[in-house]
Amino acid sequence: MLSFWEQQTYLEYDFIVVGAGIMGCSVAYELRLKYPKARIVVLERGLFPTGASTKNAGFACFGSPTEMISDFKLHGTQKALDIISNRYEGLKILIARLGSDNIGLTPLGGYELMFSNPLSKAELEALNETLMPYFKSTVFLDISSDMDKFGFKNVQQLLFCPLESQIDSGKMMQHYWNLLQLNNIQILTGAEVKNIQGNLVEIVNTIGGTVTLKSDCITLCTNAFINEIMTDVPVKPGRGQVIITSEIERLPFKGSFHFDEGYYYFRNVGKRVLFGGGRNLDFQTETSTKFEFNKLIVNDLKV
């Protein structure tokens, strides 16, 4: 049962945003910029962001060369370019909004390892020419001549992107939440949305009670989890598996690395290596929102 004061204070809003990850925080902040006096609340079912915002590898990236070439074929060149450009512009907004230090930005660049079928000079030049109108600079460089200092084996080609960086995903989300609260945006954790009917949002809180909130504008920013609220939305999750090593003395590389069309990726975290990917080994199982290991993929990553 809610008290008189709780009913007066917590039940009605101008805007309700469901999901307090990167997307939810970004939407809420943009709403604040447009509507300075609006009552805005962000609902998060966990104690901190439940989804990929704090469970990713911490790459500030927008696509490796082979991933882009694959996307050109899959989506069409212009649509793929729009996606790539939006990723890059979004990263710039994130950095400007939160500050480099507050997201742990480390501009070490991004790399792609080619174990077979290296890109020809003409293919790389064509890709850079296609990207030039969006980035205004050369995006990818062939640095295969420097490959030995990285300590990689069986790599035929090494491509470098100076525009990519590493970030600290936990630190980033902590500061995004701080930014919302400084701008009078309320975040309610332990608030799992069970149902939406018109302008009413039914949530279950961590102590087992059911509360109904009201707003004329409700935005769902739960991404992979959206089908738990709206079953008719054609969105499938793409879960990822990530492992991390113990410390490795004299680790020969630093930066963000991809291979196999971006399906595999790794980076240094201090002296440790965070390694993830392999979703292409088991697409069906990885269309899941369960937080559990996929033994097939994890064993492949360990090898």
Regions found by a protein language model. Give the residues of each.
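Central helical "cap/lid" subdomain
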Residues: 205-253
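Glycine-rich FAD pyrophosphate-binding loop
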Residues: 32-55
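Active-site lid/adjacent beta-loop-alpha segment flanking the redox-cofactor pocket in flavoenzymes
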Residues: 251-303
